[in-house]
Amino acid sequence: AIHQRIGKIKRSGIIKEFTLSLDEKKLGYNTCAFVGVFLDKNSQYTEIIEKLKRIDEVVEAHYTTGEYGLFVKLYTKDNDHLMKVLNGKIKKIKDVTRTETFISLEEPITRNISF
């Protein structure tokens, strides 16, 4: 019964894929940060996304409303590594005018939508 239900949900497109959940800290990535990225031209965001995809530390990117053109989640080994990623990679992308960084202190809720 469970196998049939999972098959039905998968065929309907509700389940996109099965993934592993990694413990970033056990891999040495102790800093989780969210970065609001200000863009010179929001119309260039697809090109910027392609460049962000090449940065291994970036795990999510969202094109958003509000102050930021993009909101990015990344993992780094520590704050020094974070600074190197921000200054040496993200801020060097053409049309990124500035960033605002939020360091996550804890992640008390992690879940998918219930259905």
List each model region and its residues:
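A compositional/biophysical signature of low hydrophobicity enriched in polar/charged and small residues
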Residues: 1-115
